[in-house]
Amino acid sequence: MQEGKLSLESKDIAAEKRQELLRLFPETQTEGGRIDFDQLKRVLGESVDTGRERYGMNWPGKADCFRLIQSPSTATLLPVREESVRFDESENLIIEGDNLEVLKLLQKGYQNKVKMIYIDPPYNTGNDFIYPDDFVDNLKNYLQYTGQVDAEGKRFSTNLDSDGRFHSKWLNMLYPRLYLARNLLCEDGVIFISCDENELKNLIQLMDAVFGESTALGTLTVLCNPKGRSQDKYFATNHEYIVVYGRSILPKGALAIEKKDDQVEAEYGEEDEGGKYRLLELRNTHREFGQHNRPNLWYPIYVDEVGAVSTEMTHGAIEVHPLWDDGFRGCWTWGLEKAENESELLVAKEVKGKWKIFRKSYASGAERMLKSILSESDFYTESGQRDFAALFGSKEKIFQSPKATGLLKTLMETSLKDGDLVLDFFAGSGTTGHAALRLSEEERIDASFILVQLPEPTGRDDYKSISDITKERVRRVIQTHEKQSEGKLDLQQKGQSRRKGGFRVFRLAPSNFKVWDAHTDEGLEGVERQMELAVNHIMPDRTSEDLFYEILMKSEYPLTAKVENFDASGITAFSVEDDALIVCVERKVTAEAVTAIAKRSPSKVIFLDEAFGGNDQLKANAKMNFESAGVKRFETV
């Protein structure tokens, strides 16, 4: 059995990258466990670019971005049940806090688990708020911003275009967040980023640097304001962009979506026992392909006197080749083997005195690719404002220019399936959560969401921060659906929809456990304060549930992992994922409680350090008990 201390820091990104390199190139490891880059160059040979001048994107502050990425977070996420809806059932999360810190905290439990990311970051129009990160102590920086600690002269302001580092500030804000977000995407995951012309060029270069140019999937143009902005300088801008990248290179058609009912009705006019279908010509209608370069797709198909189709010659049948009207020798779209195996789908029709071969294309599962210009009225900003106003029952602009729900639903249809997870770490008014809930209610896609929003002040009395608006909007979406469902099928009977019909609120905060501050003054008072941690290392006013969720998250489990409370001989313990992990956050533990936990044979157990009260014998007996029960790892915190 392994024994150790639970790390209270977020994942060490740099260390993970080093381990990945050493796994691929073990011959580059030095005696001290470092990487010999000269050896790495020799291993890679001609693949290494040793020139001084290289094409790439650089800007003032880029080096600090890497320091931000590599500096671990010791923060935690506190559960806020009173602001949640069906906390224990829902798999949706709304997290209030600085998204950089939150993204770091999500690295352990959500790496490679997010299928889709959508963000609508500040457009950098000259009046946008750009959150000033601090690579030395970003959590303290966040607490100062939210007024949780004092800081004389701390200045948070908009990113004015008169500032000489106007573009650099925007890049410095976005780069580390995108870098961390990429780690959360699964291999076939997709990220969509809204922007306008102010930073489009920089955003594409930034995405090439973080995700790789080969994973670019395209740039969508969204008609968001048909009238155009009359205050613009030269042209009345009426569009925005969505830049789309994959976590890896995706196959053709990976983002196709199901055709709408009206489109099916219009396009699929034939019907048989297999359902609605349309006829598509089997001959390749692109003239650049033909017998000259696709000889395997040139073969005869036979049509008998009653129009029956076969790939084999029958008495009296006519031989049909994929010829163009001018005699050009084209080719079929199917190979001979496929035509033989699926000959029941082939249909012959006489056109202008000549036989042509068609194939049946059924409407069931029919897909279409999104056009690169999204011009439907459901995507307009005005539509987003109507959706928002309908929920809040007011025409007052509580939130400026919320994204259209229809736009987000369409993007989700390209990427999500039942059980998938979508992340939005610039959540704003909560359109992403709204769209995900709507798709679930319509029984089209049952996906979960994580929304992250900074508690940016609004200056209002009712909704004091943007994150308050985020939570209230999603709350109202759920309430609206429940009212509409009254008298219909009980949501409890719909299983997953009930489970998705809620959200858990978490709030960014300093760790529940007082940790050594590496940035403290080295004076006597500073050292004395740090020494106090050895006496009482748990923050005051923190609950058992607060402690549990920090341990859960830092043990590499998602915040929505299956959890069961149970009684262990008079004390409460938490079982995670059917005893894969058992956590006990009681301040005092007994031998009987240890025995009760050991009987469940968990894979891993975690206790508080102080639970053993300095009783080395009790702790030693606990270790022996757990080892006998087959526990693989025993940790304390």
Regions found by a protein language model. Name each.
Residues L174, E187-D188, E197-Q263:
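Signature of N6-adenine DNA methyltransferases within the class I
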